[in-house]
Amino acid sequence: MNNSEFSKIAETVIAHIADRIEEQNQDIDVDLQSDILSIDTTDGIYVINKQSAAKEIWLSSPVSGPYHFFYEQGKWKNRAGLELMSILTDELGIDF
């Protein structure tokens, strides 16, 4: 995947996450600026952003810590096989 393809896919998924949270939970504050998504919850602040050089999406979770995800077969996974959307669903209670 080239840089342009990565950017498009990463930006789309980050915007999708923001949209789904806003649709499903009005009590969570969402702020998306320059491909950095901040999610303010009662547990703390989540930060999701793209890392173009590594072609990864990074998640900082106040509940479970930091993660790096790569795109594989239509899903964002980390080296342990955990999926970005599954972690967010488990921790935020949002269906993605």
Curated annotation (Swiss-Prot):
Cited HAMAP family: CyaY
PROSITE patterns reported in the protein's UniProt record: FRATAXIN_1 (PS01344), FRATAXIN_2 (PS50810)
GO molecular function: 2 iron, 2 sulfur cluster binding; ferric iron binding; ferrous iron binding; ferroxidase activity; iron chaperone activity
Similarity annotation: Belongs to the frataxin family.
Lineage: Bacteria, Pseudomonadati, Pseudomonadota, Alphaproteobacteria, Rickettsiales
Gene: cyaY
Keywords, alphabetical: Iron, Metal-binding
Protein name: Iron-sulfur cluster assembly protein CyaY
Function noted in UniProt: Involved in iron-sulfur (Fe-S) cluster assembly. May act as a regulator of Fe-S biogenesis.
Gene Ontology terms: biological process: intracellular iron ion homeostasis; iron-sulfur cluster assembly
Keyword Iron (UniProt): yes
Domain of life: Bacteria
InterPro entries assigned: CyaY, Frataxin/CyaY, Frataxin/CyaY_sf, Frataxin_CS
